[in-house]
Amino acid sequence: MALLPQEVIRKKRDGGRLDRAEIADFVSGLADGSISEGQVAAFAMATWFSGMNRDECVALTLAMRDSGDILDWSEFGRPIVDKHSTGGVGDNVSLMLAPIVAACGPNVPMISGRGLGHTGGTLDKLESIPGYNIQPSPELFRQIVDEVGCAIIGQTANLAPADKRLYAIRDVTATVDSVPLITASILSKKLAAGLQSLVLDVKLGNGSFMTDARATKTLARSLVDVANGAGVNTLALITDMNEPLADAVGNALEVENCLAYLRGEKSGTRLDQVVMAFAAEMLVAARMAAHPAAGEAMARQALESGDAMERFALMVHRLGGPADFVDRSEAYLEKAPAVVIVPANRDGYLAACETRELGMAVIALGGGRTRPDDRIDHRVGLAGLKPLGTKVERGEPIAFVHAADRQQAEAVRDRIAGFYAIADERPASRPVIVSRIT
């Protein structure tokens, strides 16, 4: 006989281990509303204090996955692979990665999210493209994935609905940072997308949600262990987020940066290292490449041949965007009325930056949300960001502020200059790929 919800809560509060049936019953009540908001909050707090072992977290992930629709791609006969990032600043990797990997053979049905806190959201970036539909019908989504090889859309109401309710309650009960609940939340949505393989980008640094190396590794290990326990071939790369990844932060600006990357104009950058590392790992996971070096060679060929750009263009068009978007992006992406230079305040080397504050500055410009119902100004942001280690002279531009008006641009410009430290000596370089968790 199933335990009453309060008995499940009591068992977890007291440090007990819940079995699969107990977790499934609780999640069923979470999804259908028969368990009260107070009981859900108590369960979340009990989990925050007592934690979960791997088997419990696998059971919670699968139960939340099974609370709604599960996509089935078996009829396509191609590997189904995806990537998830825990969020950063100037992180537009998904925009390039999906068409690059699709050009190499696998299908990439990417279900993405909006901006969260100081980090940008893939959907917000894509919505800077006129007509782009992030909520196509399930039939159109499948058709585009079949024809193009990839499609980037938003979560539907019927994918992991139990997670939506649990997350909303976690958000107001100080339980967002529970590793088991983070793990189940991320993976339930990804597993509902019908993936066979998953590669995770777990960010570490002052522009990520986790700034502590040990906590970051704990989360990466939890995600990898639980996803593999749930039957999805998964690994994680911990990547550096102590400076913006792209040289632009902001929605339309990051789309323009994506197009420059797909034209081959960003080779050798930290962004390029991350895109190629994830493309290589995804192709190995999909068994399209024997090892990462072979996967990177395939990805580089897809980029240099123009195949990846063609797939991006077709994806945009099939999801409602202009057919000639990649050729005439300047005609379609709105431009900010005011652009001002952020000058270096002294001679020296860019030694460090407050990455989170750069993300918050873009939100202050209107490029992100402080409330869920806020409208985003897709035009605004930062561009021309110089990477750390660059030698600069006093007065030289280290960034450009794109804003809705001159007054706003100048106010943010004065803040941005203070977010950079300039030193006499060149700083030691940091690897962008910190570690690999399997």
UniProtKB/Swiss-Prot annotation:
The keyword Membrane appears for this protein: no
Matching SUPFAM superfamilies: Nucleoside phosphorylase/phosphoribosyltransferase catalytic domain, Nucleoside phosphorylase/phosphoribosyltransferase N-terminal domain, Pyrimidine nucleoside phosphorylase C-terminal domain
Pfam name, any one: PYNP_C
Record field: catalytic activity: thymidine + phosphate = 2-deoxy-alpha-D-ribose 1-phosphate + thymine
Disulfide bridge positions per record: none
Gene Ontology biological-process entries: pyrimidine nucleobase metabolic process; thymidine metabolic process
Keywords: Glycosyltransferase, Transferase
GO molecular function: 1,4-alpha-oligoglucan phosphorylase activity; thymidine phosphorylase activity
Biological pathway: Pyrimidine metabolism; dTMP biosynthesis via salvage pathway; dTMP from thymine: step 1/2
Keyword flag Glycosyltransferase: yes
EC number assigned by the record: 2.4.2.4
GO cellular component annotations of the record: cytosol
Known role: The enzymes which catalyze the reversible phosphorolysis of pyrimidine nucleosides are involved in the degradation of these compounds and in their utilization as carbon and energy sources, or in the rescue of pyrimidine bases for nucleotide synthesis.
Family assignment from sequence similarity: Belongs to the thymidine/pyrimidine-nucleoside phosphorylase family.
Subunit (UniProt): Homodimer.
Protein name listed in UniProt: Thymidine phosphorylase
Classification of source organism: Bacteria, Pseudomonadati, Pseudomonadota, Alphaproteobacteria, Hyphomicrobiales
